[in-house]
């Protein structure tokens, strides 16, 4: 998209991590999140979830109880995610550190293999997109111990947030945003914004995204720019504290 003609015909839909996290995990990115892209509108948001499988006893029903189980079983103190260097990776480790538990992160190439190992009992827990867990919860195959948003998700109102369970600093929601090539004229950006916001307001779009655990959320270009800066400013110190680099 950064090389596309800045006429509104090319629009990028990307998760926050590509713009707010990867600049800190990769020493050399082929793009500049600010200079190469023009914010158009937010698209959707979703929370993360912490799920456990059959390796964790049924008596464990909360994150504090999971941390106590890890302490009693240090050889099993593992947590997985779909990718190294992702927000999911960091949230899991921060959760352990806040509880005084040194968790080992196991990165998978995508969520499906991570879920398979959790269901098979070789991996105790997984930090993943909340929507990924919804069908598995309905089938009784996993237990969701926490969600990561500021409030309980409407998709899992019975599941307490991390903040409710004592992890006040672990309030995170991922977002998707629409971006045009950098340098796109403001009138063109606004036309794209109006079209996208109208599309996102359609009931079939709202319902379709809800199936995946996504909440529709549109915005002005400036609101998206402000959100990107806030995400960038928040994740930089987190990545530095974790000490992770994808290039190492």
Predicted features along the sequence, with ranges:
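An extracytoplasmic/periplasmic, membrane-proximal ligand-sensing/linker region
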Residues: 101, 161, 186-248
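Non-transmembrane alpha-helical segments in soluble domains
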Residues: 2, 64-67, 115, 119, ...
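Short helices/loops that flank or line small-molecule/ion binding pockets
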Residues: 1-6, 93-94, 98, 112-122, ...
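Conserved functional loop/turn residues at catalytic and ligand-binding sites
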Residues: 5, 15, 107, 121-122, ...
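Alpha-to-beta junction loops
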Residues: 3-13, 73-77, 99-101, 119-126, ...
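Short beta-strand and adjacent tight-turn residues that come in two discontinuous sequence segments
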Residues: 11-14, 42, 108, 127-129, ...
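Hinge/capping helix and adjacent helix->loop/strand transition within the periplasmic-binding protein
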Residues: 3-9, 24-113, 162-164, 175-208
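A ligand-binding cleft/hinge motif common to bilobed small-molecule-binding domains
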Residues: 17-28, 94-98, 125-159, 236
């Amino acid at each position: 998209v950064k090389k596309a003609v800045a006429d509104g015909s090319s629009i990028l839909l990307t998760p926050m991590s590509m713009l707010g996290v990867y600049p800190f995990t990769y020493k050399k990115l082929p793009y500049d999140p600010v200079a190469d892209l023009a914010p158009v509108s937010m698209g959707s948001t979703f929370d993360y979830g912490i799920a456990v499988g059959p390796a964790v006893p049924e008596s464990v029903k909360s994150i504090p109880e999971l941390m106590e189980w890890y302490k009693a079983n240090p050889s099993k103190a593992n947590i997985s995610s779909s990718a190294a260097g992702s927000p999911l990776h960091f949230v899991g480790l921060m959760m352990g550190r806040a509880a005084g538990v040194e968790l080992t992160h196991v990165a998978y190439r995508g969520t499906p293999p991570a879920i398979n190992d959790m269901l098979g009992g070789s991996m105790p827990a997984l930090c993943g997109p909340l929507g990924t867990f919804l069908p598995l919860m309905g089938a009784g195959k996993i237990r969701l111990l926490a969600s990561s948003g500021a409030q309980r998700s409407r998709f899992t109102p019975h599941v307490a947030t991390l903040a409710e369970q004592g992890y006040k600093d672990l309030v995170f929601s991922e977002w998707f945003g629409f971006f045009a090539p950098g340098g796109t004229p403001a009138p063109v950006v606004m036309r794209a914004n109006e079209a996208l916001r109208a599309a996102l307001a359609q009931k079939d779009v709202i319902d379709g995204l809800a199936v995946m655990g996504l909440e529709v959320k549109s915005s002005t270009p400036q609101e998206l720019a402000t959100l990107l800066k806030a995400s960038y400013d928040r994740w930089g110190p987190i990545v530095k504290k974790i000490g992770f680099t994808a290039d190492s």
